[in-house]
Swiss-Prot record:
GO cellular component, one term: chromosome
Keyword Aminoacyl-tRNA synthetase among record annotations: no
Reaction equations catalysed: ATP-independent breakage of single-stranded DNA, followed by passage and rejoining
UniProt protein name: DNA topoisomerase 1
Amino acid sequence: MKLVIVESPAKAKTINKYLGDEFKVIASFGHIRDLPSKKGSVIPDENFSMKYDISEKAGKYVDAIIKDAKKAESVYLATDPDREGESISWHIAEVIKEKNKVKSDDFFKRVAFNEITKKAITHAIENPRKLDNNLVNAQQARRALDYLVGFTLSPLLWRKLPGCKSAGRVQSVALRLICEREDEIERFKSEEYWDISLKMLNSNNELFTAKLTHINDQKLEKFSITNDKEAKDLTEKLKSQNFHVDKIEKKQQKRQPQPPFITSSLQQEAARKLGFSAKKTMQIAQKLYEGVDIGKETIGLITYMRTDGVTLSNDAVDEIRKLINKDYGDKYLPSSPRIYKSKVKNAQEAHEAIRPTNINYIPNDLKEKLEKDYYKLYELIWKRTIACQMENVIMDLVNATLASENKEYLARANGSTIAFDGFYKVYRESIDDEAEEENKMLPPLKEQEHLKTKEIIPNQHFTEPPPRYSEASLVKKLEELGIGRPSTYATILSVLQDRKYVTLEKKRFIPEELGRLVTVFLVGFFKKYVEYDFTAGLENELDEIAAGKLEWKSALGNFWNGFNHNIESVNKQNITEIISYVQQALDYHIFGENKDSKVCPSCKTGELSLKLGKFGAFLACSNYPECNFRKSIVSGNDNNEADGEAKDIVNENKVLGKDKEGIEIYLKKGPYGPYIQYGEQVDSKIKPKRSPLPAGLNQNDITLDMALKLLSLPLKIGNHKESGEEVLVGYGKFGPYIKYMGKFISIPKKYDFLNLSLDDAMKLIEEKLNAIAAKQPNPLNMDEVTNLVDKKIKVKKTKK
């Protein structure tokens, strides 16, 4: 028995019908091994050794693979024809070697095919090769890079920016693009401008529209007319002018078809034309590739969908040209096949473009046999494939220049018509941001023909900010920058949404506050690693590894040395400095240009500033604790410390010193913020004495003496000079206080409560008691105001 292993049951089912009884086709159900999500899965100090585990989910499938492999005379590894597929095959081979004690590599045969057809499968089985270690190493390097970034940068994020979930090597760069576009939009200042339209009638009374372009030989620029008065004055002048056709220019323009689909262009066009997300597009394309039931049989309808190559096989081109000639006629067929070259930065072009496996499977014939969305995507791929080998579209363009009698004013009218529809017969590509109006036909015009002015219309416009990224335009931008690969685009977009860093509204990406915090932090403290050129450079290095031009562990070492140094440096960075930088970077976004927006809306005297709490970032009033206003800046955050204290976050356990008995005093971070701790906790049932860090107190300013005083609270500072009762100073939920005869009296911010004198305390007590007495009603009109606290305190009698 010869064992064939593929990734999915659907693929196995389709392939099985093309092979004889001597073959058994089984599925691995995707990856069988991966780096576990824990520390130590990649060990840089051990030459980047990688510790793979068989996932719990894959366990039963691995058992079946091992069992069948024991009976097999050879194993055909028929996973997808890219780096990831090569990696899956390598992992399967490694597990079989380990479990079945297979020593010879000849036992394994790697077969790769770009489409699941009988011809392609048979050819692959008859022409096996060995596993390509270069491709495997490139995929291992990518996985190691992603792991090292994720498992070193993410924990640092948790410590420095509570509430932020993770950072990834490529996702962070995509997030930066979205955030920077939002910054552009926020800072954009709209400007007013005007243009003038002329509604004209030719000698046959046929209406057309022209636009004013010149005044006294001066070309009108975008901002030549900037207000209503200028526009109206000019409109009045034009009403008295007589115009004629000064010049007519005619020319033809050829429009060439777009290349066949690659992964990114398929995702972009499916988003524009069908409204599919990148993830949905790839899920459907995967099914169309692996095989779908079309009634009489299960077949793979399209070629492999993860590709950046734009070439088509000679056989495919021949079949496409035959169909064009048969169904559309020879005038739609170019004299020779069209050949395309990729414009994608760092394109691998190892595979064909995405095309139907059999161009004679006409979409309309399959409409009733395919699920609705499957049909839509297949039709899109089929039409694009046909169109890419069809004749050009030919456009007739007409430009008419209109002039006033003395040529003081010139206007222009443009028109276009399709002289030959060419590939438009089958397919027309969409664009992201289409103009409001396309060129229209002009009526017949002759030079020197006199025209009638029907209407002069001043049009007001305002400049608009750049549009937010759609899925299509973001994928296009990533592709242009050379960031990511065909297999990663959909995942990048999904991860950003899953982690609540961005939302997709009206098919446009909007960054959440959490995403902006992460981006500001990374740009400020890891700028090199979120630079577009650097990330594209890493992709290029992975390509060089795949081509055997670069040793993969050497590439990992070059990256890790600098990145790890950066991590260590930021780890030592003071949280106050980080908060200060983040606030400065987000200042315009949070407060805008109006300085009054920083004024606390509650107390009207304090100033709002950024704080970080256990649930993330929030704004707090500088008058805390007198003013307890705070507001989360993270949308959807219900736990925004609205009833807690505004705190900075301390990230390290720090020893401040020892007391007289030699016990160490610690500054630590807890779930509710920084605190002081007396000694180590040696018994899990007995907690050492602790004291929260007062709000507004910078943890870097805490001294041993201050810490000891905090731990001694509540502290007796003396006895009241009149009543003889003890006076205590403490610190609680609402800040520092004086405790006197069962009453709690807040200590204003202007006092240093840790060094409060008895005289100051007595003054605050008296003010408080007088305030209480003043608020008491006196319905009996008594001569003496009753002392509500204690009769031992003497009070003056009021006059009747």
